[in-house]
């Protein structure tokens, strides 16, 4: 059995064993918390969902949803502009220096499309496996961190780094930053 097939079977089994929940904000009362509203209909692995209730007057609940629903509908999205010009920053407009890491691994701005596809693929895969960490939660939403691994283009081996995402309703995660650190 080849390694790729074995890994696919292993991931499928892992995914089917995950318990998923959908966050639901019940529209009762007059006032609503921005953080709670931003979580409405977002999906999380049960063990890695934000703690409910979030606050004393929280009306939110979590409802179990089938892993098959998550697997069928989950999607990872990223804007091309997160790679070109943001990540590689050819005009030094952003002044974040993230391009230096990728360039040291042999990547250039011409690799932006490949990086976008690969980071989306691995982001979705790791989200489905529950391999994410909760980050900041506020009225804009719940951020998660997902570790991805890419091959070095200028040598042997791989490099692993953290990517930053926002959890959106219905199983969508959207990339905030393609490089959040090692």
Where are these regions (language model features)?
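Domain-core detector
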Residues: 1-55, 63-126
